[in-house]
Amino acid sequence: MLPARRVRSLIAAASTVVIAGTGSAVDVAAQGNTSPVNDRPNPYQTVEGWAKLPDGRAWGSTSAVAIAPDGRGIWVAERCGVNNCLGSNLPSVYLFDANGTATRAFGAGLILSPHGIDVDREGNVWVTDCACTLRGAQAPGDKGHQVFKFAPDGKLLMTLGKAGGARDSSGLWQPNDVLIAPNGEIYVSEGHSSSENAIARIRKFSKDGKLIATWGQWGKGPDDLDQPHALAMDSQGRLFVGDRGNDRIKIFDQSGKLLQTWYQFSRPSGIFIDRQDRIYVADSESGSVAPTRKDWKRGIRIGSAKDGTVTAFIPDPAENPPSTSSAEGVAVDAAGNIYGAEVSPRALKKYVRK
């Protein structure tokens, strides 16, 4: 069974916003921000310590989790025991079986800040290196700001972007996430900074890596992006982008026309859409870690990608963490188990039905 596809973003003109899962739509510019849905039941229980790294090694930060084509294997990109792989020779990409045992590992010495991940229909693994978690350290000019395509055995098949990055069309800058559409086209969301005039855009490539188009610019308006952090695609081929800095999900068609804007899923760090068009949205930055959103709740919101209804919510068990908490990346296997990749807690959590 093939895994569900995930998607990306784009930019366009006027649109609609769905209010708090009601399904009603109004003009985005007139509406402005809307508080997320916080009061849905939690039908899941948490499995701590499920996945074990080789040799008893401690987990580093992770925001990247995806499902293998068999619906059972779990691919994770992990930051070498800390929050980046600068100077490390540890592998950063792992495949776990259904029991949480690492069965494959690769990527050592190649990736500085593994951030986003996708697995295509052939089982190839795509990982972004945003070079955005170095905490003041100087990134070497021969690494960073790239997207890597690996065969399932770890062989490097393709590289998008040039080492060291570029803010213009000659390269990528802080690629947050990558999505491979069913037709093989590649979408990359760029820009991890929320500062004014930062890079915030979507790149579209052909299946062989040729740049087709670029959309987006930084801003706070209805047609802008601010830190496009996550990508996913539904069964209709609509592109979902987690416009995290603007606390919303933007939905586009594949030509870049803006269709809807949703606020009810909170501040989206990660998005996953399964084959039944259930949507899973991870918020790792609200509540106590966000002064302007103290009344919002971190966690994973679950609902319908068809109409935006929120039906369930897995809250972050940490009430007052000092920094980002709960899942930043999210994926769901063929059995319906949810996996949350966490940055500050440095963990891969599993959520199963109660």
Task: Describe the role of every protein-language-model region.
Residues 14-17, 48:
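Active-site-proximal helix/loop capping residues that flank conserved catalytic or ligand/cofactor
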Residues 11, 19, 34-35:
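Short hydrophobic/aromatic-rich motifs at helix boundaries and adjacent loops
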Residues 26-354:
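Eukaryotic scaffold repeat domains enriched in small/polar residues
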Residues 17-27:
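C-terminal segment of classical bacterial N-terminal signal peptides
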Residues 1-14, 22:
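Bacterial N-terminal signal peptides that target proteins for export
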